[in-house]
Amino acid sequence: MKLSLVAAMLLLLSAARAEEEDKKEDVGTVVGIDLGTTYSCVGVFKNGRVEIIANDQGNRITPSYVAFTPEGERLIGDAAKNQLTSNPENTVFDAKRLIGRTWNDPSVQQDIKFLPFKVVEKKTKPYIQVDIGGGQTKTFAPEEISAMVLTKMKETAEAYLGKKVTHAVVTVPAYFNDAQRQATKDAGTIAGLNVMRIINEPTAAAIAYGLDKREGEKNILVFDLGGGTFDVSLLTIDNGVFEVVATNGDTHLGGEDFDQRVMEHFIKLYKKKTGKDVRKDNRAVQKLRREVEKAKRALSSQHQARIEIESFYEGEDFSETLTRAKFEELNMDLFRSTMKPVQKVLEDSDLKKSDIDEIVLVGGSTRIPKIQQLVKEFFNGKEPSRGINPDEAVAYGAAVQAGVLSGDQDTGDLVLLDVCPLTLGIETVGGVMTKLIPRNTVVPTKKSQIFSTASDNQPTVTIKVYEGERPLTKDNHLLGTFDLTGIPPAPRGVPQIEVTFEIDVNGILRVTAEDKGTGNKNKITITNDQNRLTPEEIERMVNDAEKFAEEDKKLKERIDTRNELESYAYSLKNQIGDKEKLGGKLSSEDKETMEKAVEEKIEWLESHQDADIEDFKAKKKELEEIVQPIISKLYGSAGPPPTGEEDTAEKDEL
């Protein structure tokens, strides 16, 4: 099981340092990526400091959105989010709420009611079905959508660094289970990234916060409430050693749930006032989603916000006011529910509220005044720290960790000790969960225990590995099963079977069972096979991703050649019509020939927007063959003829 885990025990020994130096050549610059439910962010450790990298739109955070336009173009990030209301069925977001989950997971079933795109069941998992243009339908695994977002972050970093990026540290919510972590790693592979570490978001935020606070031991509570997930972690920082003491949370609570409550309120209100049910109109719902999110943000700094939507539904406008008080009332139960994990984390770490030295707020939703107030009241009036940008903290910490892994000396002796978020154990007689590694155990770790057979002459034992806190395995989550065979005949209770659980630095669990009498061994690496993509599927998705990149490139080339022909034709049209330029110098016969040729090409363009590159090139050549002899005749040898391109060279069409 892939546990909450970060980079443990790095740069402690000179040997480790030398080894890191050796690795440095292979990995190049390692980037840190915060792959968020609603927004993602990328950073790099460079020249002794972290740079959060802005995307091609100049924004330091990028929407985790992917869209497919009717023309067959794929958009990622801001461009995808900006056209959500006009193309809701083919604009995919919230992939992180589906990744690593099964189709019948209650949260998946709840989510698909509200998602504008189609989610279908495939191999017991949720897949996303969209029209990718030209009437073609395609299904994508959530990993593939996340991979597209990761590709965008990778390209953002490459544009800034001016070189290829192949290795990354990617963050996940601390409460993500094994399947969700593995699926995130698979998304990295599909995007062409070697994910060197999966680290927990609150741990990353604590690194960002604690990097410059190296004196003495501090207890830090990280409260991370983002667009789709909620995490609380308690860490101690002691001279650059970060230890996660306890972690808790809800992988399905965030800003989008607050938006949803407000949307439901307005949909009901609209129905009450007009008798019309807006839910039937996907576009109207997405328009409302966009405006509600804007209003929510505005309410962090003002007490009321107006929501105005022109031609909202059946041509009618929508105009309502949302007050901060109403927003809080609609979400109060959700806001209050964030305090339970805080209480649990304190109990798990045997600390009192007064033992907390710093409270760090992370994630855009912590800008909500009511959330800040509840946290402050819970800690008896203690003010949370403000010196950290809640949107960028996680990527910042991931970038520091990436710096450590690429052997950057400026990171100092940074050590991260993380914990596993859930208890691990095996099933014993009667369906009992026998715990081997309790939750909040620092990893990496290794534990062994001796078991025996339940019946006489039993030749095989089945080892079933579970994660969870309940006393019976039926209430916990099965991670994997394997058999140890060839046990010699013996009365029950005589054979000695040693079961060992070992968690490595990435939180991957390996379980071994050994018959002490015969030395016969079997082992399993928990990779959640029933939930994971197979290597073949990953390979296919990598190829698909490359195909998409290739298609994006071809599409751009096609648009460029179309624009060249269009610019050439219109430039000629303008020059022929201008008496000061060509128009005044041509004979009426030549003018008519050129006008006819130009009009013909413009008409052809209008009816052949989707022609291929060769057609556009051929049509341009045809036009040149008619125009150039006329212009050459006109100018004789008085210098290069105006090809009509002089005004358009080096400029992209808008």
From Swiss-Prot:
Modified residues (Omega-N-methylarginine): 492
Annotated effect of mutating residue 585 to R: Complete loss of in vitro methylation by METTL21A
Single GO MF annotation: cadherin binding
UniProt keywords, alphabetically: Acetylation, ATP-binding, Chaperone, Cytoplasm, Endoplasmic reticulum, Host-virus interaction, Hydrolase, Isopeptide bond, Methylation, Nitration, Nucleotide-binding, Phosphoprotein, Signal, Ubl conjugation
Activity modulation notes: The chaperone activity is regulated by ATP-induced allosteric coupling of the nucleotide-binding (NBD) and substrate-binding (SBD) domains. In the ADP-bound and nucleotide-free (apo) states, the two domains have little interaction. In contrast, in the ATP-bound state the two domains are tightly coupled, which results in drastically accelerated kinetics in both binding and release of polypeptide substrates. J domain-containing co-chaperones (DNAJB9/ERdj4 or DNAJC10/ERdj5) stimulate the ATPase activity and are required for efficient substrate recognition by HSPA5/BiP.
UniProt PTM: AMPylated by FICD. In unstressed cells, AMPylation at Thr-518 by FICD inactivates the chaperome activity: AMPylated form is locked in a relatively inert state and only weakly stimulated by J domain-containing proteins. In response to endoplasmic reticulum stress, de-AMPylation by the same protein, FICD, restores the chaperone activity.
Residues where N6,N6-dimethyllysine is found: 585
Top-level enzyme category: hydrolase
Annotated positions of the O-AMP-threonine modification: 518
GO cellular component assignments: cell surface; cytoplasm; cytosol; endoplasmic reticulum; endoplasmic reticulum chaperone complex; endoplasmic reticulum lumen; endoplasmic reticulum membrane; endoplasmic reticulum-Golgi intermediate compartment
Biotechnology: Antibodies against the protein protects endothelial cells from invasion by the fungus R.delemar, a causative agent of mucormycosis, and could thus potentially be used to treat mucormycosis disease. Antibodies against the protein also protect a diabetic ketoacidosis mouse model against mucormycosis.
Positions with biased composition (Acidic residues): 644-654
Main location (coarse class): endoplasmic reticulum
Glycyl lysine isopeptide (Lys-Gly) (interchain with G-Cter in SUMO1) crosslink residues: 353
Annotated effect of mutating residue 229 to A: Impaired ATPase activity
Family membership noted in the UniProt record: Belongs to the heat shock protein 70 family.
Known role: Endoplasmic reticulum chaperone that plays a key role in protein folding and quality control in the endoplasmic reticulum lumen. Involved in the correct folding of proteins and degradation of misfolded proteins via its interaction with DNAJC10/ERdj5, probably to facilitate the release of DNAJC10/ERdj5 from its substrate. Acts as a key repressor of the EIF2AK3/PERK and ERN1/IRE1-mediated unfolded protein response (UPR). (Microbial infection) Plays an important role in viral binding to the host cell membrane and entry for several flaviruses such as Dengue virus, Zika virus and Japanese encephalitis virus. Acts as a component of the cellular receptor for Dengue virus serotype 2/DENV-2 on human liver cells.
Notes concerning its domains: The interdomain linker regulates the chaperone activity by mediating the formation of homooligomers. Homooligomers are formed by engagement of the interdomain linker of one HSPA5/BiP molecule as a typical substrate of an adjacent HSPA5/BiP molecule. HSPA5/BiP oligomerization inactivates participating HSPA5/BiP protomers. HSPA5/BiP oligomers probably act as reservoirs to store HSPA5/BiP molecules when they are not needed by the cell. When the levels of unfolded proteins rise, cells can rapidly break up these oligomers to make active monomers.
Record-given protein name: Endoplasmic reticulum chaperone BiP
Organism name: Homo sapiens (Human)
Gene transcribed to yield this protein: HSPA5
